[in-house]
């Protein structure tokens, strides 16, 4: 997986998106917050970008598919965000102050359920 960076015009507001890393998601198996080794390359590429651009931060937003209860989906989406953040911080040494975490529960962003089981990565100011 290669992460391409696209510069976007954005207002100067706090936490506004200034870059989007492509692909912008780390995907997960159903009811899992374990990062699959095939998805870790996306985390690695994100970390390399952060090391090359020490003035940027990331917003990680966790999602779940439509299966399960609202409560269960909120829990799993939060666990997914924490898994990605923990890897970025613990394994790769990025300062936790450069990470903003959020979780939304159910996502209908994509037509395929398996694509909605993800953490969306956005580079922010």
Residue spans for each PLM region:
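Periplasmic OmpA-like peptidoglycan-binding domain that tethers envelope proteins to the cell wall
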Residues: 38-40, 61-125
């Amino acid at each position: 997986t290669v992460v391409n960076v696209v510069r976007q015009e954005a207002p100067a507001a706090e936490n506004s998106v200034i870059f989007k890393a492509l692909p912008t998601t780390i995907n997960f198996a159903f009811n899992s917050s374990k990062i699959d080794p095939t998805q870790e390359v996306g985390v690695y590429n994100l970390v390399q970008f952060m090391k090359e651009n020490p003035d940027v931060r990331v917003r990680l937003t966790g999602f779940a598919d439509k299966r399960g209860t609202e409560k269960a989906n909120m829990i799993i989406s939060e666990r997914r965000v924490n898994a990605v953040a923990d890897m970025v911080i613990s394994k790769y040494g990025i300062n936790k102050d450069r990470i903003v975490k959020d979780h939304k529960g159910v996502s209908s962003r994509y037509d395929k359920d398996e694509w909605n089981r993800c953490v969306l990565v956005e580079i922010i100011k």
